[in-house]
């Protein structure tokens, strides 16, 4: 493994240790975070946000690394980026265009958008892991990241549902979320078309994980620190 790969792996392991230590200190690793449901949660909102921000940042880092690895190995000179622009299955969600717009968006709307994005990725992440496992010669660097992202996405969704329950007690988050229909493209026998579909999915994952990370940090600053950050 080259020095760059070792450095990236070391950084990820360090972040995992930090997250694990935080969760151990909070007593939320060996037992459920809220054993009696979000309405009776004993973990503070600040701690829930701290955990969520770190997990979302970790997911975005993994997504970026996985996309870059796939781009380097399978997409050079193929022009996949021109087909990937504006073709994400989550494009129908009315997300803020930039950080300034996000800052002007009500916190309940931002939380609903985060929940919608996370839920919309449950299915494609499951199939991404399955299809990468079956990909001939797929590097472990891509598969291992896909597995981690699928697991962390579920954890982050659970955490965001708890945060939503604390910030807006009694509210029920029932907004519909986009459904992914790209599995046939990941399974086509046309190799270029299949790689293009993988490229598009990873490009969208990197984009959406960046949005989630940005929105979560804004919410953390606004709700926990009263915008003093």
Curated annotation (Swiss-Prot):
Assembly with partners or alone: Interacts with PRLR.
MF (Gene Ontology): hormone activity; prolactin receptor binding
Residues annotated with Phosphoserine modification: 56, 64, 120
Job description of the protein: Prolactin acts primarily on the mammary gland by promoting lactation.
The protein's name: Prolactin
InterPro entries: 4_helix_cytokine-like_core, Somatotropin/Prolactin, Somatotropin_CS
Gene of this entry: PRL
Gene3D superfamilies: 1.20.1250.10
Secretion signal, residue range per the UniProt entry: 1-30
Any one Gene Ontology cellular component term annotated for this protein: extracellular space
Pfam families: Hormone_1
Subcellular localization(s) per the UniProt record: Secreted
Keywords: Disulfide bond, Hormone, Lactation, Phosphoprotein, Secreted, Signal
